[in-house]
């Protein structure tokens, strides 16, 4: 006969294992049945969407007027230069600063890599990353704005906040490359129905994975603190979601701005899929069953959605989903 409980079991064991540089495994147990998934899923979402990182947000290149231009004496055109630049992971050295403006000048011939961008204001966590090749008798002069932020911000949202001579960049701030979890059963006092959460977390080096995990827990605690008020005096109003909300803006990002491979983009485009929100509301099987969707294309889409804070199979808030569906239906009817 099972003993009657008057409160849920409190987990007592936690372990942290360093798998490799910038990757850890965290195990915690035992949880009551159902508690593990309840806690693990929002923590994973917070890790992917709310961890603070750094990214270039605007670029100005001497002699260049737009992002589809070429750069005299440089092997890469502007669009390829921007793609390479976005792969470089910066660190602002002054922890009190939210943004820095940088200026660089280089003369060829040389192969320009990320380590050449290190100075008194910024560091680079992947110094071996390739940026450009400068030909003999050529030079490259450019200015760059690097900012601190969370999640993903499309270039359209940045355009109106910078001077007209700068090119706005899609900003991928999140430093968390991977955040997955598994739920395992564990035995407690002859009861096999207790659960263990095992997190696998990897970052790009801008932040240590254990720090990202602690910050996600802190964010969750702050968000939950609203329920610590006296509920008898709390307002009964529901959340008012506007069309300008950050969450909705992310879901309405156009797929053609995500820098997907040509094969992957064409697969989605031929299926009439234009917006991130259309992918987010699809199940894993629905995504995989898109015509001509191969494994590489699926993995590329899954990684991109995870960067945006919407892993495949995840959930959209109940108050966001109707507004998203209305906007998509309106756009499709035009």
Swiss-Prot record:
Region annotated Alpha C-terminal domain (alpha-CTD), chain positions: 247-334
Protein name listed in UniProt: DNA-directed RNA polymerase subunit alpha
GO molecular function, one term: protein dimerization activity
Gene3D superfamilies assigned: 5' to 3' exonuclease, C-terminal subdomain (1.10.150.20), DNA-directed RNA polymerase, insert domain (2.170.120.12), RNA polymerase, RBP11-like subunit (3.30.1360.10)
Region described as Alpha N-terminal domain (alpha-NTD): spans on this chain: 1-231
Role: DNA-dependent RNA polymerase catalyzes the transcription of DNA into RNA using the four ribonucleoside triphosphates as substrates.
Domain of life: Bacteria
